[in-house]
C-alpha cells in the first residue's frame, strides 16, 4: 500500500536526522513482532515473573516516558509492560503496516509472545482500544481483561474523526505528508484540546517534543485512515471483562457518548473521572491505578 510505504520512508528519514539523544529515564529496548520492531519497557528483569501482567500502550503523541508515574505505582503489584504501537513513538512502521485491526492485534500478541507472557490485562486508550478489542477477539484465552480509556464504539470514533481530525489527514498520501510536516504543531495544539483548561500542558508537550527531536514518529494519518476502513460491526460482541475509564473534560470528545462502547462489549463497566480530560491514566495516575488494580482483582492493593 502506497500510504504505508510513504509512512515508512518519512519516519525513517526523521529518525536518521534526529539528535539520537532520547531521555530514556525508563530502561527500554526493541523487540521483534510479526509486524515489525517495537520499543518496549518491561518491569520484569526476566521472563519468570509470577505477578499478573498489565500491558500499557501510549496514546500518541504520548510516548513510554509519559507513563513513568503510572508505571511506578503499578510495579509493586504487577508486571508492567509498556510499548509504542507501530507508527508511534520509537516503533517505526514497516512498509506494509497499514494500522488495520488485525495488524494492531498482531503487534499486541507479538509482544506477549516475545516476552513469554501467557495472559495479560490490556490497559489501552482511545484508538488503541480497538486494537485491544481485536486482540481479545483473536486470543480470548490470553487477554484476561480490558481497561480502556476514552474508547467509544468504532461508529462513534468514525464520527469523532469527522468532527475533530482535519480533512487533509483523512486523505491517503496527503495525510501522511501533512502529518509528518506538521507533527510538532499538531502535538502542541492537541494537548490544548485534550486536557482540561486548568491543566498545564507544558510537561506533556516537553516529553513529546523531546521524543520528536530524538526521532520518534506520530503517524496519526495512518491510524485514522486504517480505522476508517474497518467495519464497526466487526468489533461487536466481545465477551472479555471490560472497564471503560472516561475523562469528562476531554473537549475533543465533547459530543462522544462513552455508553456507545456497549455496542462492542455489553458487559462493560464505565467509570467516570469528572476532573480529567483525554488522558485519565496520566492526569490522575494514582486514582487510575486503583481502578486498574481493582479490575484485575487486587482490591486490597495500595497504589
Per-region residue spans from a language model:
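Acidic catalytic loop of the alpha/beta-hydrolase fold
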Residues: 248-253
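Active-site loop/oxyanion-hole signature of alpha/beta-hydrolase fold enzymes
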Residues: 81-127, 290
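Catalytic histidine-centered segment of alpha/beta-hydrolase-like enzymes
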Residues: 273-289
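Short beta-strand/loop motif that positions the catalytic acidic residue
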Residues: 238, 244-246
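Conserved HGGG/HGGXW glycine-rich cap/lid loop of the alpha/beta-hydrolase fold
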Residues: 39, 43-90
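Alpha/beta-hydrolase fold catalytic core
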Residues: 1-54, 77-78, 117-118, 296-303
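Conserved alpha/beta-hydrolase catalytic His-Asp/Glu region
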Residues: 157-159, 179-237
Amino acid at each position: 500500500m502506497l500510504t504505508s510505504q510513504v509512512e515508512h520512508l518519512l519516519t525513517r528519514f526523521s529518525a536518521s536526522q534526529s539528535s539520537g539523544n532520547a531521555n530514556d529515564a525508563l530502561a527500554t529496548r526493541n523487540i521483534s513482532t510479526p509486524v515489525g520492531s517495537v520499543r518496549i519497557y518491561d518491569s520484569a528483569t526476566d521472563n519468570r515473573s509470577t505477578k499478573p501482567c498489565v500491558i500499557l500502550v501510549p496514546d500518541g503523541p504520548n510516548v513510554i516516558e509519559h507513563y513513568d508515574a503510572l508505571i511506578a505505582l503499578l510495579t509493586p503489584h504487577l508486571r508492567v509492560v509498556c510499548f509504542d504501537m507501530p507508527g508511534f513513538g520509537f516503533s517505526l512502521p514497516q512498509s506494509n503496516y497499514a494500522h488495520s485491526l488485525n495488524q494492531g492485534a498482531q503487534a499486541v500478541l507479538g509482544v506477549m509472545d516475545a516476552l513469554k507472557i501467557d495472559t495479560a490485562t490490556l490497559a489501552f486508550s482511545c484508538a488503541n482500544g480497538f486494537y485491544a478489542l481485536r486482540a481479545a477477539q483473536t486470543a480470548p484465552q490470553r487477554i484476561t481483561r480490558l481497561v480502556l480509556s476514552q474508547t467509544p464504539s468504532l461508529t462513534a470514533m468514525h464520527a469523532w474523526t469527522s468532527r475533530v481530525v482535519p480533512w487533509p489527514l483523512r486523505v491517503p498520501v496527503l495525510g501522511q505528508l501533512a502529518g509528518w510536516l506538521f507533527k510538532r504543531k499538531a502535538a502542541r495544539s492537541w494537548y490544548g484540546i485534550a486536557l482540561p483548561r486548568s491543566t498545564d500542558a507544558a510537561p506533556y508537550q516537553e516529553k513529546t517534543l523531546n521524543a520528536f527531536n530524538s526521532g520518534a514518529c506520530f503517524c496519526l494519518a495512518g491510524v485514522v485512515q486504517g480505522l476508517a476502513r474497518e467495519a464497526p460491526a466487526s468489533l461487536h460482541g466481545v465477551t472479555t471483562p471490560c472497564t471503560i475509564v472516561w475523562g469528562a473534560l476531554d473537549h475533543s470528545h465533547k459530543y462522544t457518548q462513552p455508553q456507545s462502547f456497549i455496542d462492542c462489549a455489553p458487559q462493560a463497566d464505565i467509570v467516570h473521572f469528572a476532573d480529567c480530560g483525554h488522558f485519565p491514566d496520566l492526569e490522575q495516575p494514582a486514582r487510575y491505578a486503583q481502578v486498574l488494580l481493582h479490575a484485575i482483582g487486587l482490591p486490597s492493593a495500595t497504589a
